[in-house]
Amino acid sequence: QKEVGTNCTWNINHNMRIQTTELDGVLLITPPVMHEDFRGTNTEVYNDAVYRQNGINYNWVLDSISTSRRHVLRGLHGDSHTTKLITCLHGSFYFVVVNNDPTHPQYRQWESFTLSDKNRLQVLVPPKFGNGHLVMSESVVFSYKLNAYYDRDSQFTIKWNDPEFNIWWPIRRPILSERDSAG
């Protein structure tokens, strides 16, 4: 870090933290706060060179932003070929990733994380994994990067409370779309 004034620092080293998780291929990433002072922070959410230096080599083709309100549960969605990078920009949500590859030894195993604008965590979700989120704050804004365009034919939906997956959610009666209710 470099001092640039009273109560003001710049992180010029791009100190990104990458952690493996219990699920093969799923990564938990903490991007660096580049600048912090009495006005707030500036976080570098994505820097292609830094991600590539850390072995995250994807050609992202689509960035989307999603908003939801408290107790909305979206998911669990996925497909056979897309990698996603999920980032919470405002609020907080309970995020679940589940292995949906029947040929993999971790099939039906899942892991959860809390993503928020405070902890800055990102989750890298590989192909053949479903993911879903439950909004815990009043509202949430999150972004996701995709390395492939939407392909309806390769999509799958896992019912949020499917007993075969036995996923724990913090509430029992979330707000669901028709698609997510049906699974």
Question: Where are the regions a protein language model picked out?
Answer:
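Acidic, Ala/Val/Gly-enriched low-complexity intrinsically disordered segments
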Residues: E3-V4
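Conserved metal-binding segment of the jelly-roll/cupin
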Residues: L115-E138
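Non-catalytic, conserved peripheral segments adjacent to functional cores
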Residues: N15-K118, S139, L146-G183
